[in-house]
Amino acid sequence: MLPCRRLVLSCKNQAASFLRRCGPSKRIQSVNYCKSTRQGHEIPDVKPLFPTGGGTQAPSRSRARYAVPAILLGFAGFVGFLHYNDERRAVPRGQASSNSGCGCGSNTTVKGPIIGGPFTLVSTENKIVTENDFCGKWVLLYFGYSFSPDVGPEQLKMMSKAVDKLESKHNEKILPVFVTLDPQRDTPSHLHAYLKEFDSRILGLTGTASAMRQMAQEYRVYFKKVQEDGEDYLVDTSHNMYLINPKMEIVRCFGVEYNPDELSQELLKEVASVSQ
């Protein structure tokens, strides 16, 4: 009988040892106690100490909730800055430029596009020229460069013929002005020799790279160097002409689609409308 009792105790000890080795769940838990209204004794309320996988979704959703409005707000601020910068550089519609110095009132009507602004450049005679030097004159302003292989020379010829026709047949004087977009090669002496081949009345203007870039921005002129190979390169530009009235207001913009006769007729219309 004694050996049987020892065998039973041995089995119990082995079972207890096995249970101790297995132990409880390894998940760390915190135990809170609450009183049960039914049992009248404390019941442990077991909750994980650290959140499991399902609890990580809330912070992610919270971050996404604030990220989208922040991105939209930043984009709106960037667009607003660009608009403010553009308005700051432009001549307001319906008003003359406050920097023109031509005595224009604030109620002066501007028919042309919202472009233009102050500038300081150098003429082919190495003299400083600003927008104030054009006050009281009709000006036909052309942006180009002397190394243009085709469009540039054609535009200068058209400018010369149109201005000459207005002066000889209608006694209307318009000052033709050539503004280079390639100051690196178009020095005052080079421009003087180049423009002399077309018309000695054309005033050539050049300057530093930053000054030319600023004026191009003020007058909304696109230009970009292409096919660069050392000193041999072309400049891609829109080849626009601007008619400026004696108050330094942009009246019209002319593209390459005009011929000399059409250009002179359009110029005469604008000059005559102001003279009436």
Curated annotation (Swiss-Prot):
Determine if Mitochondrion is one of this entry's keywords.
Answer: yes
Q: Where in the cell is it found?
A: Mitochondrion inner membrane
Q: Where is the transit peptide?
A: 1-14
Instruction: Identify the residues that the record assigns to the Thioredoxin domain, covering every copy.
Output: 110-273
Give the record's membrane topology: Single-pass membrane protein
What is the first-listed, main subcellular location in coarse terms? mitochondrion
GO annotations of cellular component type: mitochondrial inner membrane
Listed under GO biological process in this entry are: copper ion homeostasis
Alphabetically ordered keywords of this record? Chaperone, Membrane, Mitochondrion, Mitochondrion inner membrane, Transit peptide, Transmembrane, Transmembrane helix
Q: Which Pfam families match?
A: SCO1-SenC
Observed phenotype of the null mutant: No visible phenotype.
Q: Which residues cross the membrane?
A: 66-82
Tell me the tissue specificity.
Expressed in the whole plant with highest expression in imbibed seeds and embryos, and the root hair zone.
Q: What does this protein do?
A: Thought to play a role in cellular copper homeostasis, mitochondrial redox signaling or insertion of copper into the active site of COX. Participates in copper and redox homeostasis.
Q: Which family does it belong to?
A: Belongs to the SCO1/2 family.
What PANTHER family does this protein map onto?
ELECTRON TRANSPORT PROTIN SCO1/SENC FAMILY MEMBER, PROTEIN SCO1 HOMOLOG 2, MITOCHONDRIAL
Q: Write down what this protein is called.
A: Protein SCO1 homolog 2, mitochondrial
Q: Which organism is it from?
A: Arabidopsis thaliana
